[in-house]
């Protein structure tokens, strides 16, 4: 069974001075502003790379939780940050890398298990699979 999720974007104006809004069908994002200044100049609002990072961090955390459960483990906490790199490449811009930074507290997990299972989650996460970028993982087992 396929799952279909929807999001929409509205844009007005040219690239540098225009403004857009992003919404999701769940309403979690409702006309959230985005634009050139937020993307390239640190202005207010969100940007596509930040949203991809949030989606990737969330997807990875859920995938890791599932993989831990399959291995008979349960995390007390999983904290994931995604650093998304946008680079200028031939003919424009591309997301060239995503660095996932994981800190997790997992009672009973060995360092070897943690490394194996977190890498399995990195490879198996649906958002990882859709990105054509180098994805690295910095993982810390805490507690």
Label each region the model flagged.
Residues 1-54, 61-143:
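Extended beta-strand/beta-hairpin segments
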């Amino acid at each position: 069974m396929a799952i279909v999720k929807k999001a929409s974007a509205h844009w007005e104006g040219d690239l540098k001075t225009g403004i857009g809004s992003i919404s999701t069908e769940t309403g979690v994002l409702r006309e959230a502003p985005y634009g050139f200044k937020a993307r390239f100049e640190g202005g207010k609002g969100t940007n596509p790379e930040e949203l991809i990072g949030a989606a990737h961090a969330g997807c990875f955390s859920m995938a890791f939780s599932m993989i831990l459960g399959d291995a008979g483990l349960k995390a007390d906490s999983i904290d994931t940050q995604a650093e998304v790199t946008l680079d200028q490449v031939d003919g424009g811009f591309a997301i060239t890398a995503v660095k996932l930074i994981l800190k997790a507290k997992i009672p009973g997990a060995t360092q070897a298990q943690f490394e194996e299972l977190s890498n399995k989650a990195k490879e198996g996460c649906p958002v990882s699979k859709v990105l054509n970028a180098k994805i690295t993982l910095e993982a810390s087992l805490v507690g």
